[in-house]
């Protein structure tokens, strides 16, 4: 069994990419489980055709404790027999959402949820923002990480931060970076830029996913593209990504770059202009 995790900036299309890719894997005959590690509990909605799956934390609160839960209450099978679990989290402003991830994964292990699987995938909130969300990395639960990014500065900034988190635990937990997935925003020279970023991070751009409106059409119906329009070229993009992950033998310890190096890269590719110190802090009327 391989345990992988998808990380990336919030709003980058991580959950959509993860669900479509796992759908393609299941279509290939792989036995897959998705563990959502986001308080929004939206990591399985396209597989289950639901708004949000009832989470481990929510059910535990209703029952009294995690120990009172039955596995079939939190683990739901969706399309192609994909097993789905959402860790969930507390109400906004109350408690630590990262604790939900820790509690849920521990419960799933004890309850035997990981038996007879080829792939377990963790869909993790945004950046590596706290120890709880970093748990799949920190405790070696996820052996390989895929970072969803784009040619936009903040997406690349988040990717570099995540690489830094992987590096921190690479020697103690054995986690490795499997590659960058470019979820295209149609920015200039985007594929070249992400290939170069990957090179500097000591990894690969494992796949470039072109922008296609069929993804949104499928999402409105709470479906993956694989199910909604299986013959669409976008469905083939996810199939290609799934196969590349299955066959991937390039799992590395990343080499994060500095903020200055990232800005130099963006300037080199024309995404950012060279900073003119003489105009910093000057209003339009003065400049």
Swiss-Prot record:
Top EC group: oxidoreductase
Record's comment on post-translational modification: The reversible ADP-ribosylation of Arg-99 inactivates the nitrogenase reductase and regulates nitrogenase activity.
Modified residues (ADP-ribosylarginine): 99
Described purpose of this protein according to its UniProt entry: The key enzymatic reactions in nitrogen fixation are catalyzed by the nitrogenase complex, which has 2 components: the iron protein and the molybdenum-iron protein.
Chain segments annotated as transmembrane: none
Residue numbers binding [4Fe-4S] cluster: 96, 130
Names of required cofactors: [4Fe-4S] cluster
Keywords tagged on the record: 4Fe-4S, ADP-ribosylation, ATP-binding, Iron, Iron-sulfur, Metal-binding, Nitrogen fixation, Nucleotide-binding, Oxidoreductase
Recorded family membership: Belongs to the NifH/BchL/ChlL family.
Name of the protein described by the UniProt record: Nitrogenase iron protein
Gene: nifH
Database matches in NCBIfam families: nifH
InterPro entries listed in its UniProt record: NifH/chlL_CS, NifH/frxC, Nitrogenase_Fe_NifH, P-loop_NTPase
């Amino acid at each position: 069994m391989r345990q992988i995790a998808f990380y990336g900036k919030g709003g980058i299309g991580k959950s959509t990419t993860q669900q479509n890719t796992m759908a393609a894997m299941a279509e290939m005959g792989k036995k897959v489980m998705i563990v959502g590690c986001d308080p929004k509990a939206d990591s399985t909605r396209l597989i289950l055709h639901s708004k949000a799956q009832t989470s481990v934390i929510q059910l535990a609160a209703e029952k009294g404790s995690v120990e009172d839960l039955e596995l079939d209450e939190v683990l739901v099978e969706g399309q192609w027999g994909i097993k789905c679990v959402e860790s969930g989290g507390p109400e906004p402003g109350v408690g630590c959402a990262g604790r939900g991830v820790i509690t849920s994964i521990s419960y799933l292990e004890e309850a035997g949820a990981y038996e007879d699987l080829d792939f377990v995938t963790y869909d993790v909130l945004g950046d590596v923002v706290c120890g709880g969300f970093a748990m799949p990395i920190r405790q070696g639960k996820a052996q390989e990480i895929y970072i969803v990014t784009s040619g936009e500065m903040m997406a690349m900034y988040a990717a570099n931060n995540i690489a830094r988190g992987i590096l921190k635990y690479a020697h103690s937990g054995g986690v490795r970076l499997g590659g960058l997935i470019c979820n295209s925003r149609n920015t200039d020279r985007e594929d070249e830029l992400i290939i170069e970023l990957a090179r500097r991070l000591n990894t690969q751009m494992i796949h470039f996913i072109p922008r296609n409106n069929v993804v949104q059409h499928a999402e409105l119906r709470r479906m993956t593209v694989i199910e909604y329009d299986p013959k669409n070229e976008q469905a083939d993009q996810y199939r290609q990504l799934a196969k590349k992950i299955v066959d991937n033998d390039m799992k590395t310890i990343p080499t994060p770059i500095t903020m200055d190096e990232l800005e130099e890269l963006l300037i080199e590719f024309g995404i950012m202009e060279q900073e003119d110190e003489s105009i910093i802090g000057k209003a339009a009327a003065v400049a």
